[in-house]
Amino acid sequence: MADKPDMAEIEKFDKSKLKKTETQEKNPLPSKETIEQEKQAGES
């Protein structure tokens, strides 16, 4: 592996080969309601 990227390689890269993907949240943060429910469940 070279330390510097190969500019010729970058320039000939074809962006059209990339396909658009839908971004999916792998680990969505819980809502405030969910957190409150879990707190209450833990206390009882």
Curated annotation (Swiss-Prot):
| Tissue distribution | Originally found in thymus but it is widely distributed in many tissues.
Compositionally biased region (Basic and acidic residues): 1-25, 33-44
Q: Does the keyword Ubl conjugation apply?
A: yes
Q: Glycyl lysine isopeptide (Lys-Gly) (interchain with G-Cter in SUMO2) crosslink: positions?
A: K12
Q: Which UniProt keywords apply?
A: Acetylation, Actin-binding, Cytoplasm, Cytoskeleton, Isopeptide bond, Phosphoprotein, Ubl conjugation
Q: Which domain of life is it from?
A: Eukaryota
N6-acetyllysine-modified residues are K4, K12, K26, K32, K39
A GO cellular component entry from the record: cytoplasm
InterPro entries in UniProt: Beta-thymosin, Beta-thymosin_sf
- Compartments in which it is found: Cytoplasm, Cytoskeleton
Q: Which residues carry this modification: Phosphoserine?
A: S31
Transmembrane portions of the chain: none
Which of the residues bear the PTM Phosphothreonine?
T23, T34
Q: According to the UniProt entry, which residues carry N-acetylalanine?
A: A2
Mention one GO molecular function.
actin monomer binding
For this protein, the record's Pfam families field holds: Thymosin
Any one GO BP annotation for this protein: regulation of cell migration
Annotated region Disordered: the residues are 1-44
Q: Please state which protein family the record places this protein in.
A: Belongs to the thymosin beta family.
Could you tell me what this protein does? Plays an important role in the organization of the cytoskeleton. Binds to and sequesters actin monomers (G actin) and therefore inhibits actin polymerization.
Q: What is this protein called?
A: Thymosin beta-4
Protein species of origin: Oryctolagus cuniculus
The encoding gene: TMSB4
